[in-house]
Amino acid sequence: GCSHNLCVSITGIKDQFALEGEKLTQEYAALALGTAFHPYFVGSTFDPEAVGIEKQMLRKALEDEVNDKRLYCQRQANREFFGDSPAGVRQEGYLEEVDGLTPEALTEAYYEMLRTANIELIVLGCDEASTTAVKDALLTELSAIDRAPLPRAENIAMPRREPVRKVEHFDTTQAKLCMLFTLGR
């Protein structure tokens, strides 16, 4: 859709159950915030070797998607229906875009995300002091960034247009049909 989510999540035991009274919540927060705000760079960009590995995995996942005919049909229909609108942009991107991913481009996108993202903090199962400490740690990280969060995307309806029919042929015994409709005027 128009908004994509990146979730950094940590689950662990409460401080009160730590064997030696450790402040586990602080450690969880440090780990999550370190992951989000201090990724591993080689020089000033993401590690080229790691990017190469991730590109291979992404390529494989996108190529394998065609084996799940229902999902493939739905995603192809969304791509056709929404076109270039923000709702048509897939979180994973598209197979033809994988080769263009570079450590530099990904690093630039990462910094843009930090600058413009709407950020929500959810802390569950902690006392008020621990929750406040986590919030303060996040605010400290954010204070080092020149932020300009974008407004949240409004719900959109695609404009009415002539029906489009797209057919792809596969060597299968079962067909899939996906139909999308709009309330757009």
Residues covered by each model-derived region:
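His/Glu-based metal-binding/catalytic segments typifying zinc-dependent metallopeptidases
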Residues: 118, 147-185
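Charge-rich, well-structured scaffold segments of protease-associated domains
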Residues: 1-150
